[in-house]
Amino acid sequence: MNPQLSPKAIREIREGTCNPLGAPQVTTDLSENIILTSLDDLHNWARLSSLWPLLYGTACCFIEFAALIGSRFDFDRFGLVPRSSPRQADLLIVAGTVTMKMAPALVRLYEQMPEPKYVIAMGACTITGGMFSADSTTAVRGVDKLIPVDLYLPGCPPRPEAIFDAVIKLRKKVGNESILERTKTEQTHRYITSDHEMNLVFSENTGEYLNKTSANSIPSSKKEKITELPDNNEKAEIIDTLEN
């Protein structure tokens, strides 16, 4: 090395040899306009800001949700856009009682929704069957027996403010998810509900139920066919016959 070079010149030569391109120079204006993020965060941010619900309202709970559409609550600020087709929705809001006849339709709508999809069970009737869970044979005692539920919203019915709180909690859940981890919707918890205790009812079209002995059945020997309206005496005889 040339001994006539100054120490500063020698230092510059060494830095140029080790790093010929030099350190990148980023201006202050450019550094303030750069956001570093991950693919998961970007994807979740886009999804939580544009939840498209499919409204499945069957009872009075849906009236409270309909109040959100007005200007007083304005659910558009959360990016909620109601859809009429399950193929365009990613959020299913079940509001009201689910009956046995409507259960297949609910499951079909859920299966037609694309992944990832979420479910909010709104109201006591949706979560446990509500007032119909005690003696009704047609009400489903908990919608989580049919489809997985992400968020339970109790109430009879829940207030619109409670619905907003449920949507905010769901947005937090969506924001913490990962694309690689969420491959399929899986329910991690269940609401404690009572099981169904139903007996098979024989077809009334064939009349087979008349041949089955039960506590409420009438013996065939005491059955009478009434073709015209009986008088008071005949009514008393028929009642005595049925009681005996």
From Swiss-Prot:
It is a peripheral membrane protein. Keywords: 4Fe-4S, Iron, Iron-sulfur, Membrane, Metal-binding, NAD, NADP, Plastoquinone, Quinone, Thylakoid, Translocase, Transport. GO terms for molecular function: 4 iron, 4 sulfur cluster binding; iron ion binding; NADH dehydrogenase (ubiquinone) activity; quinone binding. The keyword Lyase does not apply. One of its GO terms (cellular component) is respiratory chain complex I. Binds 1 [4Fe-4S] cluster. [4Fe-4S] cluster binds at C60, C61, C125, C156. It is found in: Cellular thylakoid membrane. It is an enzyme of class 7 (translocase). GO terms for biological process: aerobic respiration; electron transport coupled proton transport; photosynthesis, light reaction. Its cofactor is [4Fe-4S] cluster. It catalyses: a plastoquinone + NADH + (n+1) H(+)(in) = a plastoquinol + NAD(+) + n H(+)(out); a plastoquinone + NADPH + (n+1) H(+)(in) = a plastoquinol + NADP(+) + n H(+)(out). NDH-1 shuttles electrons from an unknown electron donor, via FMN and iron-sulfur (Fe-S) centers, to quinones in the respiratory and/or the photosynthetic chain. The immediate electron acceptor for the enzyme in this species is believed to be plastoquinone. Couples the redox reaction to proton translocation, and thus conserves the redox energy in a proton gradient. Cyanobacterial NDH-1 also plays a role in inorganic carbon-concentration. Belongs to the complex I 20 kDa subunit family. HAMAP family: NDH1_NuoB. NCBIfam families: nuoB_fam, PRK06411.1. This is NAD(P)H-quinone oxidoreductase subunit K. It comes from Prochlorococcus marinus (strain MIT 9301). The gene is ndhK.
